[in-house]
Amino acid sequence: MGKKRSASSSRWLNEHFKDPFVQKAHKQKLRSRAYFKLDEIQQSDRLFKPGMTVVDLGAAPGGWSQYVVTQIGDKGRIIACDILDMDPIVGVDFLQGDFRDENVLAALLDRVGEDQVDVVMSDMAPNFSGMPSVDIPRAMYLVELALDMCKQVLAKKGSFVVKVFQGEGFDEYLREIRSLFTTVKVRKPEASRDRSREVYIVATGYRG
């Protein structure tokens, strides 16, 4: 016999399928509800313009890349990476691999090539154990790697949008971003669940 779902996982599934943004994404045949988070950020911060080059970290299942394609057009370029596989999206150059691995990072940088990137975006998150003392440091490690990517490829005056989980290390990370960008906002999109610790740091005007 199969194992029964725990009460917490059953509650999560119930909440997930009742989520209006999940239902809306399903109706519109979108990859995920994350599409709407980025749309809200774009409406307020205007990060994406036609012809831009964008790096998407933690891309699967593809909600953010799917959205950005609609904003940057045929002349734009998206280089996406995730440890999980992702179904192809026209206009997206996808690399499957663990971004923490030096060889995967080298392959990603090779895909970027000589181009300077206009926007680096990261929706990366670790597999959560339910223990904040374990989960928050893992999450902070990923967002530090995303910021390191900015330092390597982001064009002067470029932008960075990153999902961060509030907890130990958050304030220091925010301070570091403020030292590198001219304008920094912390956003909590409507499609982000209220009880989630996640927020999105939107940083523009990279000092280079």
UniProtKB/Swiss-Prot annotation:
InterPro entries: RNA_methyltr_RlmE, RNA_MeTrfase_FtsJ_dom, rRNA-MeTfrase_E, rRNA_MeTrfase_gammaproteobac, SAM-dependent_MTases_sf
Domain of life, per lineage: Bacteria
Recorded family membership: Belongs to the class I-like SAM-binding methyltransferase superfamily. RNA methyltransferase RlmE family.
UniProt function note: Specifically methylates the uridine in position 2552 of 23S rRNA at the 2'-O position of the ribose in the fully assembled 50S ribosomal subunit.
Residues involved in S-adenosyl-L-methionine binding: 62, 64, 82, 98, 123
Enzyme class label: transferase
Catalytic reaction(s) noted: uridine(2552) in 23S rRNA + S-adenosyl-L-methionine = 2'-O-methyluridine(2552) in 23S rRNA + S-adenosyl-L-homocysteine + H(+)
Cellular-component GO terms for this entry: cytoplasm
Annotated compartments: Cytoplasm
Pfam families according to UniProt: FtsJ (PF01728)
EC numbers, comma separated: 2.1.1.166
Active site: 163 (proton acceptor)
Protein name, as recorded: Ribosomal RNA large subunit methyltransferase E
PANTHER family referenced in this protein's UniProt entry, alphabetically: RIBOSOMAL RNA METHYLTRANSFERASE, RRNA METHYLTRANSFERASE 2, MITOCHONDRIAL
Single GO MF annotation: rRNA (uridine-2'-O-)-methyltransferase activity
Alphabetic keyword roster: Cytoplasm, Methyltransferase, rRNA processing, S-adenosyl-L-methionine, Transferase
Gene3D superfamilies (UniProt xref): Vaccinia Virus protein VP39
Gene: rlmE
